[in-house]
Amino acid sequence: MSLKIRLARGGAKKRPYYRIVIADARSPRDGRFIEKIGTFNPLLAKDAENRVVLDADKAKAWLEKGAQPTDRVARFLDAAGLMKRDAKNNPKKGEPGEKAKERAKERAEKAAAGSTEDAAAE
């Protein structure tokens, strides 16, 4: 049985509230879980002390048993000092895609061709 430490969504429409739970990886997101170890309220300010409430002892025990945290929960555990999370680096994130590069190249060629025609006409 593969265990995950993940978020289970609760709350109303457009008002999310999450429980941090231990669940079987095959169970639905909001379905059956083994144990609740904390909560996460994304509507609170990032510096609010009760935005993420986590029972560190339970989380540590489940990590020792082999439960794998999801990416978001791994951030919370890293902030709490329970595990080390490597920062991700994507150097190509800000680059435009292939089609955008092609369109920019075509625009540059048209602009260059247009400026040479204007110079030849004068």
Swiss-Prot record:
Residues 111-122 have a biased composition (Low complexity). One of its GO terms (cellular component) is cytoplasm. One of its GO terms (molecular function) is structural constituent of ribosome. Residues 81-122 are annotated as: Disordered. The keyword Secreted does not apply. GO terms for biological process: translation. Coiled coil: none annotated. Residues 83-110 have a biased composition (Basic and acidic residues). Keywords: Ribonucleoprotein, Ribosomal protein. InterPro entries: Ribosomal_bS16 (IPR000307), Ribosomal_bS16_CS (IPR020592), Ribosomal_bS16_dom_sf (IPR023803). Pfam families: Ribosomal_S16 (PF00886). The keyword Ribosomal protein applies. Belongs to the bacterial ribosomal protein bS16 family. This is Small ribosomal subunit protein bS16. It comes from Xanthobacter autotrophicus (strain ATCC BAA-1158 / Py2).
